[in-house]
Amino acid sequence: MLIDFHTHAFPEKIASRAVGKLSYEGGGLMPQTDGSAVSLKEQMKQDGVDISVVLGIATNPRQQHSVNDFAMALNRDPAFVAFGSVHPDAPDALEELERIHAAGLKGVKFHPEYQHFYANDEKMKPIYRKISQLGLITLFHAGHDYGFPPPYHAMPEHLLRA
């Protein structure tokens, strides 16, 4: 069984815009799909991938519910294992983690550059504690990112102190 642990898919209405933005910010990395779940499944078939872990990001506090609703819908397809996302500044981040867990999502993805926080920020402690209590996987987009200038928010030293 071949599992691709880092893929992205977006709702149809924003897929092309999201892929365009990621392409522009990606330092020359070209997307292999049009951003839709249908296109991702086609690419999986071409590449012999059985399961894709789909990672979405709530880039602002208002997005976390819609990002997670999409992840929950994707999870109905056995070809996908979607992770949820919470935004560190969302007032209901802890409650959203409960919803992610109750829906059967396996983990939570953070992208400190897009979400504007350091991995070792104090404000993250209650979120990390709740993730641990719920037994969810925590995944960071870490290190250098082509789309963002320094300083980087999830370098190894930040993760070690998180």
Language-model segment annotations:
Residues K106-G107, N120-A162:
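Catalytic pocket-lining loop regions of alpha/beta-barrel enzymes
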Residues M1-K125, K130:
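Mid-domain alpha/beta scaffold segments of enzyme catalytic cores
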